[in-house]
Amino acid sequence: RDCLLSRGLGDVYKRQCQFAVAAAGQAITDAGLTMEQEDPYMVGCSVGSGIGSLQAMEREYDRLKEKGPGRVGPMLVPLMISNMAAGNVSIAYGLKGKSLNVVTACATGTHSIGEAYRTIQYGDADVMIAGGTESSITPIGIAGFSALTALSFSEDPERASIPFDKERNGFVMGEGSAIVVLEELEHAKRRGAKIYAELTGYGCSSDAYHITSPAEDGSGAATAMLNALKDGGVEPEELTYINAHGTSTHHNDLFETRAIKLAFGEHAYDLKINSTKSMVGHLLGAAGAVEFVTCVKEIQEGYIHRTVGLRETEEELDLNYCRDSYKEEVPYALTNSLGFGGHNASLLLKKYTE
């Protein structure tokens, strides 16, 4: 909020853009990135929002019904469309390189970071400001996901977002933004940047199966995971930890478990698997970015958080979903995101060593 007010933008941006601009400012400051010392055309932005601004749409639709089409605000479209998060981050910080808005539902944040990674790999940018943002806790947002039976109906908050538990019955919607500064390694080293971890692999696939359900056999998500490992030059047996999509819905947690077993075989039983959504809820298009940051910090601190609320699993959910937290070295972390429409994305991180 202070960041936005200092720029005079608090009343212009809708919430998903406010979150993104504020988070980007924090990331740029933390990275010690000084735009005056960079070629602005080599610093880009890849910030996605899965839905855009429902608030703007709801407000102007009410105005349409009450006062007619002539009273609809002229800024409805620019305030509503999902690419405004990336656009406003670029404007706020003078980023003149490639600017992307990836929209792949709940895989948006992960794809956004992955596409930023590819942009740097291809030499199209030295630095990318990347992540996701979302603000869909509105009447139509809650009603829509409730009608889809995706939200938890538990009256006990402690049992409302419990990924992989046999009593899971849906997710709790969250909102916010997570943004990171991705940088070509030699460029980061030359300017003495603080390096938290390395992003070394990115894998994607499409289920081509159903508009809301992941593929039942897990083949799509398994392919994305294996593609990320292959891209990073890591054998499946070298991985010890996965940050799962883990939405606390019946189908996702079951089918993602099948995907992990399909990708890793017997090694799946040696993996530690957790869900950050057990603590912060499901941030939709920002979820993958939040979970990416979680993995970065877990690698840095040598800590794997527990899956909160997990008490008892069902027969087929027989992997280690981290009922307890672990204090141990995390050499690699794989984070998964699965989006409506069958979009699958995985990112592989590794511990940075000089």
Predicted features and spans:
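Active-site-adjacent elements of ketosynthase-type condensing enzymes
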Residues: 52-56, 135-161, 203-223, 247-262, ...
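Active-site nucleophile and cofactor-binding loops and adjacent substrate-binding regions
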Residues: 14-17, 40, 74-83, 100-108, ...
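Active-site-proximal gating segment of KS-fold condensing enzymes and close homologs
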Residues: 49-100, 142, 146-150, 252-266
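Active-site-proximal alpha-helical scaffold in enzymes
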Residues: 20-33, 82-85, 90-134, 172-193, ...
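Short, well-ordered amphipathic alpha-helical segments that serve as non-catalytic structural scaffolds
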Residues: 20-31, 85, 112, 183-185, ...
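Single conserved hydrophobic/aromatic residue that forms the stacking wall/gate
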Residues: 1-13
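Condensing-enzyme catalytic core mediating Claisen C-C bond formation in acyl metabolism
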Residues: 156-232, 241, 354
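Phosphate/pyrophosphate-binding loops at sites that engage ATP/ADP/AMP, CoA/4′-phosphopantetheine
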Residues: 27-39, 188-195, 225-241, 263-267
